[in-house]
Swiss-Prot record:
Function according to Swiss-Prot or TrEMBL: May protect the nitrogenase Fe-Mo protein from oxidative damage.
Organism: Paraburkholderia xenovorans (strain LB400)
Lineage: Bacteria, Pseudomonadati, Pseudomonadota, Betaproteobacteria, Burkholderiales
Name used for this protein in its record: Nitrogenase-stabilizing/protective protein NifW
Gene expressing this chain: nifW
Sorted UniProt keywords: Nitrogen fixation
Family statement drawn from the similarity comment of this UniProt entry: Belongs to the NifW family.
One Pfam family matching this protein: NifW
């Protein structure tokens, strides 16, 4: 039988994690926020001062609660509001590009 950590390593998608931990989910929420949910989940894990060691059932319960919390964040909010990724953190999700910088980025035109 695989250890808890080995089983976690085999998971890859948000759906895999949610199913593994027995968390019911709305596919529409996951379709929009899958990467955000997983990143938030791992942020929550890193924020824990102490996680149960040597007790796989307690570790499973802790991870279950953290994933449920991460998923819940995106049920009641949007990725843009949660700002998990840097692109949403910088300048409130807005980026100003001047017309001059766009012109400068275009290749020079040659007259035929």
């Amino acid at each position: 039988m695989q250890s808890f950590v080995q089983q976690l390593k085999a998971l890859s998608s948000a759906e895999d994690f949610l199913q593994f931990f027995g968390i019911p989910f709305d596919q529409k929420v996951v379709n929009v926020s899958r990467l955000h949910i997983l990143k938030r989940f791992f942020q929550y894990i890193r924020q824990q001062d102490v996680l149960p060691e040597g007790d796989e059932a307690a570790l499973f319960a802790s991870y279950h609660a953290l994933l449920l919390k991460a998923y819940g964040d995106f049920v009641i909010s949007t990725p843009a509001q949660e700002k998990v990724f840097k692109v949403f953190q910088d300048t409130a999700g807005r980026q100003h590009v001047s017309l001059d910088s766009l012109r400068a980025s275009l290749p020079a035109r040659t007259v035929a």
